[in-house]
Amino acid sequence: MKVGVFDSGLGGLTVLKSILKVLKNAEIFYIADTAYAPYGEKDSALILKRCEDITNYLLKEYKIDALIVACNTATSAAIKHLRDNFSSLIVIGTEPGIKPAILNTKSSNIGILATPSTLKSDKYQLLVNELSSIKKVNLFEQACPGLAMQIEKGEINTLTTYKMLEEWLIPMKEANVDTIVLGCTHYPLISQTIKKIMGEDITLIQTGDAIAKRLLSLSEEKGHKNIGDLKVTVLHTGLINLDMIENILENKNIEVRKCEI
């Protein structure tokens, strides 16, 4: 089985890491579209065009069977278009884990950390409206401009990143938020910093494991056998932080090279 995974940068590697836990027999091609990062601060038309171009590239060069849109912003902008226009593919998107957050919270106060584009998207608003009937909760939504790029540069444990998070999180802490949705695939990489500010009891919801399970289920339905060896290739369209790749994937045996899309 050949699987394409993409994000504007390295955040989607948190999803890839989850996939590597469950998928045993696959060729995986990860594209970090760093020449256009971050998607979360780009307009939806450009994001849609990049998603289409990347999908066409993965189909032409690697004949993928499945596509994982490992980015909340790209999912909001393009997932319907990709499913409609690439019907031969298994297409799985990434959306904020609001439902598990609603089911988990004890205080009924939930924080949402996401990019500006995700929070403004129709898809996000539709998701919130659909889930509002499960249980009455208070959502504390926080757009985080610049945070994905801080993480992309490897500034995970820096004072600057801490101060950014502190400004956004202290109001949530004061409001007795007990569950936070990490609405960007970059954000699991700063989980420890979030816990330093919010306390160790805070529940953080990220969607990588759910995506991996969904991929495994759909691949088995298609008849793909989950035995054999894994091969992972990381492709990037612009500059990339090699140390971050090694740290996130924990020195998995991977090939890294630049591509033109």
UniProtKB/Swiss-Prot annotation:
Q: What is its EC number?
A: 5.1.1.3
- Gene Ontology terms for molecular function: glutamate racemase activity
| Keyword Nucleotide-binding recorded | no
Q: Which InterPro entries match?
A: Asp/Glu/hydantoin_racemase (IPR015942), Asp/Glu_race (IPR001920), Asp/Glu_racemase_AS_1 (IPR018187), Asp/Glu_racemase_AS_2 (IPR033134), Glu_race (IPR004391)
One Gene Ontology term from the biological process aspect of the record: cell wall organization
Pfam families of this UniProt entry? Answer: Asp_Glu_race (PF01177)
Provide the catalytic activity annotation. Answer: L-glutamate = D-glutamate
Keywords in alphabetical order, please.
Answer: Cell shape, Cell wall biogenesis/degradation, Isomerase, Peptidoglycan synthesis
Known pathway: Cell wall biogenesis; peptidoglycan biosynthesis
Q: Which residues form the active site?
A: 71, 184
Binding-site residues for substrate, renumbered to this chain: 7-8, 39-40, 72-73, 185-186
Protein family according to the UniProt entry = Belongs to the aspartate/glutamate racemases family.
Which NCBIfam families would you find in this protein's record?
glut_race
Q: What does this protein do?
A: Provides the (R)-glutamate required for cell wall biosynthesis.
What name appears for this protein in its UniProt entry? Glutamate racemase
Species in which this protein is naturally found:
Aliarcobacter butzleri (strain RM4018) (Arcobacter butzleri)
Gene name?
murI
